[in-house]
Amino acid sequence: MLSNEAILYYANHPVEFVQDILKADPDPEQKKILRSLVENQMTSVRSGHGIGKSAVEAWSVIWFMCTHPYPKIPCTAPTQHQLFDILWAEISKWKRNNKTLDSELIWTKEKLYMKGHAEEWFAVARTASTPDALQGFHAEHMLYIIDEASGVEDKIFEPVLGALSTPGAKLLMCGNPTQLSGFFYDSHNKNREQYSTFHIDGRN
């Protein structure tokens, strides 16, 4: 696994983590989003369909897992297809790019966890079909990933807002703005000042 010095460095340099450890080549917009996770508590990304945002989300999960002790990373999306077939598969793909990482991070159909720490060092996939999808998570380091956020009901966001009252919690939302109201829409409109916002095309 990474040395203590490397962990301290990469915790503040997610772009370099993605390049050095995952052997990926983020485009300029993806780099800005990754850096926003260090510099801002809440990041919201408007994007079209495509793998570009799924890659950023997957990189973010793996980066946070490897550079923060005992994190919890709840991930959600409106449908099982978006969550498991796309995002979760993307996480599996990128972690395999580093043999050491691949052996230390254990991937299952619904969970990614640090070897030997399944209950306290993990990312977990929960579909946004029930109000309690994102409830019950407590840790010093939290990263919420909400994919296709425009299709996620506002009540799902309520526990996220509660968690974001603590300094170690962060939020990354991505989605195609298909709704003209709601939590995600507001993050690019009336609540825009509270967020670091981006607009990218869906592309590889």
Predicted regions and their residues:
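Phosphate/NTP-binding elements of NTP-utilizing enzymes
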Residues: 1-204
